[in-house]
Amino acid sequence: MTTVLRRFTDHKDAGEPYKLEQDHLAARLGTSLFRDGRLRSAKFADKAVLVSGHNNRKIGAVIQKGKWKGYPVFTLTLEERATCPRSCLHWLDCYGNKMNWPTRWMADDDLIPTIGRNLSDLAREIPNFVIRLHVLGDFYSVAYVRQWAAWLDEFSGLHIYGYTAWQPGTAIGDSISTLARDRWDRFAVRTSNGAA
């Protein structure tokens, strides 16, 4: 008997990306297409903002290979475009344009304390775990990057992987690159369309 590690086992061709026009309101304002009912402040989180990768067809519940094999995966989804650099190559054709179901968490004053509580809960229950940053969205400030560095110090079982559109040479990009260089064993975040 095999164990299914994904909630969704059928993979369908995603087709062509849905590309916004330059003058589309979401492109101009830097927001998600799905703000109504899908964008929430963490202060209203009735459940965790870090959710099992089991709910994502591309990620799955547990790491299957490598040094983190066997570690459960949790994901964080922020609002695309609102947290991303306008220089992102996928500003208009972000795959979030076709993702109407995920809840996007606002980068507001309640997000960091809520993530901290979620991490504390996970650390009490699970010796080693992985956070996939970010299914949608990106690092939105240097302070936010530094907070992840502090959480790495606080929670020895925390491991992080993901991608960022923030390029080296920007304040946020340099913060991410430095953290990845110094803590690659637990902070494996790569720069999209560029070197790690």
Please report, for each region that a protein language model flagged, where it lies by residue.
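Class I S-adenosyl-L-methionine
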Residues: 1-196
